[in-house]
């Protein structure tokens, strides 16, 4: 097995060499390792022809895994008193959010949180006024379908739309959608951990590990990356389907994967990928036969998943000509390294004493000692079929999170088109976190069983819960967002095309545009079109005549200047615009103690 595994690793690009005292060993070709595996295999058959290749899997109903399969095949009743554990899980998942809950219009920064509020508001606007062009944003004029330049967060947008259309503040709606993700994740992990362990106390620990996972704090600005709660439930739904396949269970599995895809396209794609080794391991351990009922169940799941992926994927496919593909060089810069699983997120309070000199954005992947410790207990032998599948799929997610630094991600990139649009393979780290949280629940269940013999299980529950809460506590730095928009936007109409300066504050302008609806030559998203990147270079010396001509060619009809966001260069820019032919003032005022101006830009002759 070792030689065969070595052959696979070498074939995937893991060729290497090593030195033994007096000897240099070359592992450059898979054929030598494969030949060695064949020789060992023949020798093993010669010595023990009747011993199964995988004796640990057992045979027939006496298999050690059969009891677990029967548990998942049934629909066990909800345990008495479980409601209290659910309440504890939900409250624990929100305890470190308290500073933000007290100030629902505060944000950690003026980038992605503001962008998310604009996304939800723009989707609601299009849904109500132009549903045929649902993904058309008002950024990067004159490109269409600009909501597809990043994750459209369709699930959150559909839920938020009625509130925004009724007049609710989009930023508060977006923040509430953000907050909801934490208890939703905790409930998802609670349910999955309960189905795996049968212990509501262990489920509470699993829910806390998932709901407060370090990945949440690393990505505290990203709305869609908080929505991890469908993933553990989908894994459990797959187990249940393999245990007792029915079309209904297939539809349930498909719906969960579809919901994850609609909430976060990254996680939907990654979940579907990780489910392959996970399902294969469970099916192998349980010796699942390819019956007609299994085919029906999997077909039902596939239909639901295909419909959801196609419905959301089609607009992205249509805009692919503009967006192109992520080159592997760019993917490499957002690929994790194994050592970065030891780099804690900055907001993880218990580890702020550790230097962050070598940490990189998107790659602070340390899950916390409590998570690792409980997961280590969870993977101690003997292993169940589900635990084994979690270990294998977690290892696969870890390998894929390495992206260009790993062995197999380039194959995903080459053979599966959706992966050619993925910018950050390191986000597979969220799936590693899912596995660790579920294994942590298994570890907690083992500790509770061990403590029950001395009647210390209640004390063990309180201590473990307290340790998890302490280990995964967060320090949040928040700031209030502007309570009002600059007064010049009262003169802006939807037919205008704005060039707004300074250029690097696009999320703010996008949020202000929710009220006026004008289009913008600039914008902020996960992808920036070549035309905008070129325009940025052409307006570096704004307000020169050449830069104004570049804005005209880009389609701009008006210019805004915001001195509160610009600072020192602003008075010089205003003087230059006032003295430039073809630029005429439309509106002016003061906002947050500084000048703001709106100018009309005469078109090219």
Model regions: which residues?
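Membrane-interface coil-to-helix junctions
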Residues: 91-185, 213-228, 334-358, 404-409, ...
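Extracytoplasmic
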Residues: 327-329, 334, 463-605
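Membrane-helix boundary/interfacial segments in multi-pass membrane proteins
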Residues: 18-30, 218-225, 335-337, 353-363, ...
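Hydrophobic alpha-helical membrane-interfacial segments at the cytosolic entry of transmembrane helices
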Residues: 82-91, 255-256, 289-314, 328-333, ...
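Signature aromatic-anchored transmembrane alpha helix within multi-pass, membrane-resident enzymes
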Residues: 298-307, 438, 442-471
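Start-transfer (signal-anchor) and selected internal transmembrane alpha helices
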Residues: 1, 37-97, 296-303, 380, ...
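Membrane-interface helix-loop-helix junctions at transmembrane boundaries of multi-pass membrane enzymes
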Residues: 76, 286-299, 374-408, 449-458
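Membrane-embedded helix bundles of polyisoprenyl
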Residues: 89, 93, 177-196, 200-284, ...
């Amino acid at each position: 097995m070792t030689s065969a595994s070595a052959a696979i690793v070498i074939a995937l690009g893991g060729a290497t060499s090593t030195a033994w005292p007096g000897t240099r060993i070359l592992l450059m070709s898979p054929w030598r390792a494969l030949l060695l595996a064949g020789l060992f295999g023949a020798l093993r058959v010669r010595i023990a022809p009747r011993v199964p290749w995988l004796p640990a899997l057992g045979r027939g109903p006496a298999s050690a895994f059969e009891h677990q399969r029967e548990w998942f095949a049934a629909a066990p009743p909800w345990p008495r008193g479980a409601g209290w554990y659910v309440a504890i899980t939900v409250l624990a998942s929100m305890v470190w959010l308290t500073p933000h809950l007290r100030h629902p219009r505060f944000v950690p920064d003026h980038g992605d949180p503001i962008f998310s509020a604009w996304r939800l508001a723009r989707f609601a606007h299009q849904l109500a006024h132009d549903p045929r062009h649902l993904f058309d944003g008002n950024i990067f004029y004159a490109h269409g379908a600009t909501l597809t330049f990043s994750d459209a967060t369709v699930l959150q947008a559909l839920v938020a739309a009625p509130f925004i259309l009724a007049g609710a503040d989009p930023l508060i709606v977006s923040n509430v959608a953000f907050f909801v993700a934490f208890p939703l994740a905790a409930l998802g992990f609670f349910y999955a951990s309960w189905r795996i362990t049968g212990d509501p106390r262990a489920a509470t620990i699993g829910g806390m590990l998932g709901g407060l996972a370090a990945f949440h704090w690393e990505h505290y600005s990203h709305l869609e990356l908080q929505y991890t709660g469908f993933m553990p439930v989908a894994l459990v739904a797959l187990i249940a389907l393999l245990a007792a396949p029915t079309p209904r269970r297939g539809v349930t599995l498909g719906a969960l994967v579809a919901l994850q895809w609609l909430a976060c396209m990254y996680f939907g794609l990654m979940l579907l990928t990780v489910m392959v080794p996970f399902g294969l391991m469970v099916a192998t351990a349980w010796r699942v036969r390819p019956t007609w009922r299994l085919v029906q169940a999997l077909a039902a799941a596939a239909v639901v998943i295909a419909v959801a992926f196609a419905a959301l994927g089609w607009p992205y496919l249509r805009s692919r000509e503009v967006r192109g593909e992520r080159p592997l060089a760019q993917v490499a810069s957002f690929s994790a390294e194994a050592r970065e699983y030891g780099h804690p997120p900055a907001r993880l309070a218990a580890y702020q004493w550790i230097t962050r000199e070598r940490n990189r954005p998107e790659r602070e992947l340390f899950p916390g000692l409590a998570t690792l410790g409980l997961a280590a207990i969870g993977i101690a032998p003997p292993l169940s079929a589900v635990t084994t599948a979690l270990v294998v799929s977690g290892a696969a997610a870890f390998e894929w999170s390495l992206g260009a630094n790993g062995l197999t991600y380039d194959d995903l990139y080459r053979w599966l088109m959706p992966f050619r649009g993925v910018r950050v393979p390191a986000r597979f780290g969220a799936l590693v976190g899912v596995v660790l949280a579920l294994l942590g629940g298994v570890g907690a269940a083992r500790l509770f069983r061990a403590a029950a013999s001395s009647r210390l299980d209640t004390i063990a529950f309180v201590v473990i819960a307290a340790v998890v809460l302490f280990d995964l506590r967060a320090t949040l730095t928040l700031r209030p967002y502007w309570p009002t928009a600059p007064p010049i936007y009262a003169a802006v109409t939807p037919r205008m095309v704005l060039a707004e300066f300074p250029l690097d504050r696009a999320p703010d302008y996008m949020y202000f545009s929710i009220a006026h609806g004008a289009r913008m030559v600039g914008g902020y998203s996960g992808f920036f079109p070549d035309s905008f990147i070129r325009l940025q270079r052409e307006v570096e010396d704004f307000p020169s005549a050449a830069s104004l001509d570049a804005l005209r060619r880009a389609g701009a009809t008006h210019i805004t200047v915001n001195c509160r966001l610009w600072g020192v260069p602003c008075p010089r820019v205003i003087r230059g615009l006032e003295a430039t032919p073809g630029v005429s003032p439309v509106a002016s005022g003061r906002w947050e103690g500084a000048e703001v101006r709106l100018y009309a830009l005469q078109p090219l002759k």
